[in-house]
Swiss-Prot record:
Residues 83-95 dip into the membrane without crossing it. Changing residue 205 to L: Increased channel conductance. It comes from Paramagnetospirillum magnetotacticum. It comes from the Bacteria. This is Inward rectifier potassium channel Kirbac3.1. It is found in: Membrane. Changing residue 75 to S: Increased channel conductance. A motif (Selectivity filter) lies at residues 96-100. GO terms for biological process: potassium ion import across plasma membrane; regulation of monoatomic ion transmembrane transport. Inward rectifier potassium channel that mediates potassium uptake into the cell. Inward rectifier potassium channels are characterized by a greater tendency to allow potassium to flow into the cell rather than out of it. The inward rectification may be achieved by the blockage of outward current by cytoplasmic divalent metal ions and polyamines. Complements an E.coli mutant that is defective in K(+) uptake.
Length: 295
């Protein structure tokens, strides 16, 4: 910091723990939900997605049922004016089930049947493609430690966090980047957020199969050299971890991210060893101790 100026002592974190932005966007033109519907349907949660698909399916069938009723008695063997019979006829038509008891009568009803069959095919194609796209998106399956620690390693203060591979399959050519994000003041007195890439003792692993302790030595080249817990908080410092690699099961690149605030840094702590020896002599990775920190 320069000129003795400091930002306010406390602010909400800029990055959520999953690495996503915690910034509210203002001044944008109001965007309707359907303006970017493909992205929205890919990113909403599964319960919301299933609810939307089910709701759209029921509403569409209900609308066609009302259309059949508006045409009069155009469904053979259906009870006159029965919305239930018209609705289930619509379901059978949209799904091309065709049990044979309920039959459209006349050109108007058959026109509606043709239109509904087309809507059913298009709807099935869209729903199936969305479900396939959601299911086939590769995920890294990487676990990040809930805390970072700053303690001595080989006689030098070191910022450390660790991650673990939750799957049996290996991740090839794994890369980790650790970035410091903090508020700084320019020579003109403007407060801005600056990103500092932190040098790691090892930022790449040819094979990532178990756990990995990521370490940044705090020497005179480090952006956090000489910093204390108080000064890091005053600059609203946050640490963003970015992980990328090629997953052998998916045969695709995967990525993961995690962010830490100053509240999630343990000064003077060290991670508990997660490797143990079983009674038969085999080595094991105990993920139950993954987040444990000793002083």
């Amino acid at each position: 910091m320069t000129g003795g100026m400091k930002p306010p002592a406390r602010k909400p974190r800029i990055l959520n723990s999953d690495g996503s932005s915690n910034i509210t966007r203002l001044g944008l033109e109001k965007r309707g939900w359907l303006d970017d519907h493909y992205h929205d349907l890919l990113t909403v949660s599964w319960p919301v997605f299933i609810t939307l698909i089910t709701g759209l399916y029921l509403v569409t069938n209900a609308l066609f049922a009302l259309a059949y009723l508006a045409c009069g008695d155009v469904i053979e063997n259906a009870r006159p004016g029965s919305f239930t019979d018209a609705f289930f006829f619509s379901v059978q038509t949209m799904a091309t089930i065709g049990y044979g008891k309920l039959i459209p009568i006349g050109p108007l009803a058959n026109t509606l049947v043709t239109l509904e069959a087309l809507c059913g095919m298009l709807g099935l194609a869209v729903a199936a493609s969305l479900i396939y796209a959601r299911f086939t998106r590769p995920t890294a399956g990487v676990l990040f430690s809930s805390r970072m620690v700053i303690s001595d390693f080989e006689g030098k203060p070191t910022l450390m966090m660790r991650l673990a591979n939750l799957r049996i399959e290996q991740i090839i050519e794994a890369d980790v980047h650790l970035v410091l994000v903090r508020s700084e003041i320019s020579q003109e007195g403007m407060v801005f957020r600056r990103f500092h890439d932190l040098t790691l003792t090892r930022s790449r692993s040819p094979i990532f199969s178990l756990s990995w302790t990521v370490m940044h030595p705090i020497d005179h080249h480090s952006p956090i050299y000489g910093e204390t817990d108080e000064t890091l908080r005053n600059s609203h410092s946050e640490f963003l971890v970015l992980f990328t690699g090629h997953h052998e099961a998916f045969a695709q690149n995967v990525h993961a991210r995690h962010a830490y605030s100053c509240d999630e840094i343990i000064w003077g702590g060290h991670f508990v060893d997660v490797f143990t020896t079983l009674p038969d002599g085999r080595r094991a990775l105990d993920l139950g101790k993954f987040h444990e920190i000793a002083q």
